[in-house]
Amino acid sequence: MKNYTPKEIVEELDKYIVGQKEAKKSVAVALRNRYRRNLLSDDFKEEVTPKNIIMVGPTGVGKTEIARRIAKLVEAPFVKVEATKFTEVGYVGRDVDSMVRDLVEAAVRMVKEEKLKKVTEKAKKIAEDRLIDYIVGKRKKQAKNPFEMLFNYPAAEKSEETEEESMQYKREEIRQKLRNGELDNYVVEIEVTDTSTPMMEMYTNLGSEEMNINLQDIFADILPKKKKIKKVPVYEAKRILESEEAQNLIDMDEVIEEAIKRAENDGIIFIDEIDKIASSGYTAGPDVSREGVQRDILPIIEGCTVMTKYGPVKTDHILFIAAGAFNIAKVSDLIPELQGRFPVRVSLKPLTKEDFIRILKEPKNALTKQYQELLRTEGIEVKYTDEAIEAIAEVAYLINQQSEDIGARRLHTVMEKLFEELSFNAPDLKGQQIVITEEYVKEQLKDSLNKYEVNKYIL
C-alpha cells in the first residue's frame, strides 16, 4: 500500500473529482490511519479497527468515483458490490460472504500482475529460446559409435563440432530476425499447455451461491498437464510462449499468501445502494431483501472469518465504504447495530451549474478532453469556447432540474447528443479544425431542450 498524506490524497482526488471536500477528507484520513496502524506494535495493531464510512448523496455526485480512485491511488484491493444483489441466507441469490471472496480474487489478480511484471524479461528470454527451437528444430545428439569411442576418430569429432557451430550460427541468425520483426508473419507450430479445463457446478459450504470448481485444480497432482499443438504466426507465438513462461516462473503459493494478507489489511469494499436495504415503511411478514440482509452484513463488517477457495480470510481490518441516495429511506432506518459500524457519516452535495462547468474543464479525464482525443484519431482538431462549455453545463443542469436528477452522468447524455452528428461525419472531415461554439451547442441540443420545455406543461 502506497504512503500518502491526507493532503496528497485530496490533491490527487481533485484531479478527477470536482468538489465534495468533506467526503475526500474523510476517506483521506481513513487511508492515513491504515498507514499509521501498520507502524504500531502488534498488540495495538490488532486493537485499531478501520473507521468505516457511509456516504449520503444523490446519484452522480461522485460517491463511487471517490472510492474507486482512492483504491487505485494506494494500490489496494478494491471491490464494488450492490447491496440489492444480496439475499438472506437460505434464499436464492448471492450471499453476503461473496463480497469477501470477490475481494480476495481482486487481491490475487493484483499480486499476480505485480509478480508477472517482475519476471517479464526472464520469461521473454526463455520464450525466445523456445520459439527458436520450434523454428529451427531441436538437433538431437547422436550417440557415438562404439568403434569411434574406442579408436577416438578425430574426423567424426570434428564433423560434430562443425555441425554444432553451424547450428549455433543459424540460431543466432534466427534470433536477430526475430528481434527485428522479420519473421512476424511466418507461421510456426508450437506446443502449449491446454488451458481449457473441465468445469463442474456444485454447492459448497463457502456459501449458498453456486460456485464453479475447477477440476484441474482438484486433480493437479494426479492428472498430467495436457499439451496441444497450435499453428500460429510468430508474433502470436511469441506472446503465447511469453505468457506461459511467465506463469511458470511465479510461485502461486506466494501469490495467494500475499493476496490474503493484502485483502485482510488493505482491502476496501464499497457497498453501493445501501439505502435500498433500509426498511422505510410498514412491512408485514419476513422482509427477505432488507433487514435479513442487514443482519447478514453485520458480522462481516464487525469482523469475522470467511472461507474462500484460497483459505480463511479475516474481515476485521477491511475498510467498508457504504453509499446511498437515501431519498426515500434515511440512515436512521438502517438497523442500529449496522449504523454503529459506520462511525463516519458524510453528506455529498447535489451538483450546481458551476460544478458542471468545472467538471467539463478541470479533471484530467474530463469529457471534453475525451471527445477531443477520440476525434483526433480521425484527424480532426476540436476546440471549445468558454461560452460553449457554459451552455453545455446549463443544458445538463436544466434537464436535471426538470426531470430525474442523475448528477454528472447527465453530461454523458448531453455530450453524446452534441457530438452525434460530428462523430457520424468524422471520416469525411479529416484534417479540419472544428470549434464548438455556444450557437452550435444550442442548435444541436434544441430538440432535447424543447422536449423538456413541453414536459413542464404536461400533467
Swiss-Prot record:
A family per Pfam: AAA_2
Offer one example of a GO biological process linked to this entry. proteolysis involved in protein catabolic process
* Annotated keywords: ATP-binding, Chaperone, Cytoplasm, Nucleotide-binding, Stress response
**Binding locations of ATP:** V18, G60, V61, G62, K63, T64, E65, D272, E337, R409
Please state the span of the N-terminal signal peptide per the UniProt entry: none
GO MF term list: ATP binding; ATP hydrolysis activity; peptidase activity; proteasome-activating activity
How does it associate, per the subunit comment?
Answer: A double ring-shaped homohexamer of HslV is capped on each side by a ring-shaped HslU homohexamer. The assembly of the HslU/HslV complex is dependent on binding of ATP.
Q: What is this protein called?
A: ATP-dependent protease ATPase subunit HslU
Q: What lineage, starting at the top, does this entry show?
A: Bacteria, Bacillati, Bacillota, Clostridia, Thermoanaerobacterales
The gene that this protein is the product of is: hslU
